[in-house]
Amino acid sequence: MSSSELRYLIAANNLAKELQSVKQTDIANSLHVTKVSAYNAIERLREKEYIEKKDRKIVLTDRGREVLNEYMTIIRFMSAHLSLHCGTSENQAYEDALNATCAFSDVTRNGVANFIKSEMNGAINSGGVCFGSESGYRNER
């Protein structure tokens, strides 16, 4: 998935938490893009079966939520480490992590997400934090 498509998927998901129904114009306004740009991106996400359009409303599919969760697991992990260990601002760390995650192959992305989840589960089971206390990446659920 391109970083642009991921931004649209994130926007649709975030708007769904705020609004009763999400429309194409809501996404366009949220991302400060034209309706045509939003339409094209939404169509690409629909073709990949990440979203559905029901009565002009945009809804994430189960597949869309699953893929988004995988991407966000990696993005949160990477951005936390970039901020903490590299002195990168939070906003820049998030952008860099999002772009890097989108550059991964599907196989690599899946492997990294599974690794992070297993590390988080290990930290939860031991009552600690991921990769030792100096990492600062606390388990979020």
Q: Which ranges hold each PLM region?
A:
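Basic amphipathic alpha-helical segments that dock to polyanions
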Residues: 27, 38-48
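Short acidic, hydrophobic short linear motifs in intrinsically disordered regions
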Residues: 18-28
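Basic, amphipathic "hinge/linker" alpha-helix immediately C-terminal to the N-terminal HTH DNA-binding motif
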Residues: 56-74
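C-terminal regulatory/oligomerization modules of transcriptional regulators
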Residues: 95-141
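A short, conserved structural fragment
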Residues: 46-56
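Short alpha-helical segments that sit at the start of domains
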Residues: 1-10
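Key DNA-contact positions within bacterial/archaeal DNA-binding proteins
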Residues: 36, 91
